[in-house]
Each structure stands twice: as structure tokens, then as C-alpha cells.
Regions:
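Active-site-proximal specificity loops/subdomain of glycosyltransferases
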Residues: 56-102
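C-terminal helix/juxtamembrane-tail motif
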Residues: 290-308
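A generic secondary-structure signal
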Residues: 43-44, 93-98, 122-125
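Short beta-strand-to-loop acidic/aromatic patch adjacent to the donor-nucleotide binding site
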Residues: 101-113
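Conserved catalytic core of nucleotide-sugar-dependent glycosyltransferases
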Residues: 113-262
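Short, acidic, metal-binding catalytic loop of nucleotide-sugar glycosyltransferases
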Residues: 40-51
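N-proximal low-complexity "stem/linker" segments adjacent to membrane-targeting elements
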Residues: 1-36
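Catalytic donor-sugar/metal-binding loop of nucleotide-sugar-dependent glycosyltransferases
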Residues: 257, 266-282
Length: 308
């Protein structure tokens, strides 16, 4: 089976009933941030350059698997921080049941202030690379150069390391290496009320049991990143295999890879030898922009407002 047919099989695509779009701008949010982040930073338009804007929230007590309400996708799942990977991949599954997506998904946080011109520029840009260097658009010379490279970008974001990780550089040893990460435990130490929220389904869960995870030194920050149809298919297939259980113990790494969404996405894609391409211009933290006149150099500004 060729790659295109395999991807279409995994993504349940029936082009006779799908809504055709170039891509999806998927903004992950939660019920808590509807009156704050979503209200304050909602994109003015519902579509950019053929890419449809969708906001997703979880509702554990929904009477169906999912439903669309305007530009909102509500999925039947926990609405908690630690379940973000589950929310993301269920969203992908249902989006690919609804839309015939040409390219892929731009996954974004709900606290981003977008430069709409830069956003359209990115969406229209050919998503190819040559040995890790993007070809086409603002980070290369010509579209002809992009076509000459003929290597599709499946996974792109801004890495804190400032580095790419190409498929031939991904080793089994890298994937198997683990660290003890207290990030999620620290978060819940400061948010004890989340354990009492029935929408979060965390009653009796000991977060400290799940601190070991694969070490991911190169990969995108969870602020915003792009995943192609191929990458989305891999994520859906993987989460289907583990029953969307973010507390699943991975025997190969002897760790819990799925509790921190961006790290989990990198782990799954690297396990399938998917290259990661670093892009500095995707976003910048507002606090790091010393000269506010340079704010338009970035596609998005990470405000980090209403964090708590």
C-alpha cells in the first residue's frame, strides 16, 4: 500500500462526504479559558488562505463523541491540562472524519496574538525542506527551489534548543533515554482544585507516579507547531493503540510518555522517524521582545496571559 493510501485509510477519509480545506488552524483551549483567553485572543476570521479555524474544548459528560458549534469543536474527554494530548488527538481524529484536509494542522495555544499577514504567509508557503533548511516563502529563495528539494515537512515548530532533528539523526538510544520531570506535578501542586473538578477526572490520581518520561532535547515548544497529514495519521494510530490512556506505561522506555502533550507528540513522531524542522519566526514570548517595534517579525506573540 502506498503512503497516500495508507494515510487516507488511517484518517478515515471519504472524499465524497468531506468538506475540502487546505488545512486546519486548531486552537486548543478549555472551559476555564473561554471567558478569558478565547475571548481576548480569538482570531477575527474563521478561515485564512483556505485553512479553517477550529477551537477545541473538552466535555467529559457530552452525550456523544463530539459536536461542532460554529467554529468550536467539543470533544467527549477530560478538560484537564494533563489530558491535553488526548484532547488533541481525539480532535484530529474527528477533524479528519469531517474535513478533506490537503496539508495538515497548525496546532496553536489559546493565548497567542497572531499577526494575520504573517499567518497567511506561513499557510501559503510550500512546506518543504532541504537538509533541514526550509525552502519557499520567507526562509528561502524561490518556489522553484522548494520544488527541487522535494522533501515534505511533516513536523515544524520552534524548539528551545534552536535545532532541527532530521530522521537519519534519530537513534533508538535517543528515544529510550528518559528523565524525571516534575513539571506536571508542580503544576498540580499549585492547582489542587483541579482534582475536585469532575470534568478533569483526576480524583484519586497520584501525579507523582508518572514523572518519568522520554528525554526530548530537540522538539517544538507546545505554544504552536505544524503537523502534516502524515504526522496526524501517526498520532491517531498511536493513541488508538494505547486506548487514549495518557497514563499508559511504555515498556520500551519504562516511562510514561503521554502526560505532557508537546513532549508526547515529539516522542511518537520520532519513534516513527519523522524529522522535526525548527522555525524561529513562528512566535516569540512577549516578555522577550525588548523592542516592541519588532513585534511584527513573528507570526504570533505568546502572551501567556490569564495563565492561572
Amino acid at each position: 500500500m502506498n503512503d497516500e493510501k495508507h494515510i487516507n485509510t488511517i484518517l478515515f477519509i471519504n472524499i465524497n462526504t468531506m468538506i475540502a480545506v487546505d488545512g486546519i488552524i486548531l486552537v486548543l483551549s478549555c472551559q476555564k479559558h473561554l471567558p478569558t483567553r478565547v475571548k481576548n485572543f480569538k482570531l477575527p476570521k474563521n478561515e485564512y488562505a483556505g485553512w479553517k479555524v477550529i477551537y477545541v474544548i473538552g466535555d467529559l459528560f457530552l452525550d456523544c463523541d463530539y459536536k461542532f458549534e460554529g467554529e468550536f469543536l467539543i470533544v467527549k474527554c477530560e478538560d484537564s491540562y494533563i489530558h491535553l494530548l488526548k484532547k488533541l488527538v481525539l480532535s484530529l481524529k474527528y477533524l479528519y472524519e469531517t474535513f478533506d484536509i490537503k496539508e495538515g494542522v497548525l496546532r496553536a495555544g489559546d493565548d497567542l496574538l497572531f499577526n494575520e499577514d504573517r499567518l497567511v504567509e506561513f499557510l501559503k508557503c510550500p512546506k518543504w525542506h532541504k537538509e533541514g533548511v526550509r525552502t519557499g516563502g520567507t526562509e528561502a529563495t524561490t518556489v522553484a527551489e522548494a520544488a527541487e528539494a522535494a522533501t515534505a515537512i511533516d513536523f515544524l515548530g520552534r524548539s528551545p534548543s534552536g535545532k532541527n532533528l532530521l530522521s537519519h539523526e534519530i537513534s533508538d538510544a535517543d528515544i529510550k533515554n528518559t528523565i524525571r520531570d516534575t513539571f506536571m506535578a508542580d503544576y498540580y501542586m499549585c492547582h489542587q482544585e483541579d482534582f475536585d473538578n469532575p470534568q478533569h477526572n483526576l480524583k484519586g490520581v497520584d501525579i507523582f507516579q508518572y514523572l518519568m518520561r522520554p528525554h526530548i532535547p530537540v522538539g517544538p515548544s507546545g505554544v504552536i507547531y505544524y503537523i502534516s497529514n502524515k504526522a496526524c495519521a501517526i498520532l491517531i494510530e498511536h493513541l488508538e493503540r494505547i486506548g487514549y490512556n495518557i497514563f499508559h506505561h511504555d515498556e520500551y522506555t519504562n516511562s510514561y510518555p503521554y502526560t505532557i502533550e508537546d513532549c508526547a507528540v515529539s516522542f511518537i513522531l520520532y519513534s516513527n522517524k519523522i524529522s522535526f524542522i525548527h522555525s524561529l519566526a513562528l512566535y516569540e514570548d512577549y516578555s522577550n521582545i525588548k523592542d516592541k517595534a519588532n513585534i511584527n517579525d513573528y507570526m504570533a506573540v505568546h502572551t501567556n496571559l490569564n495563565k492561572y
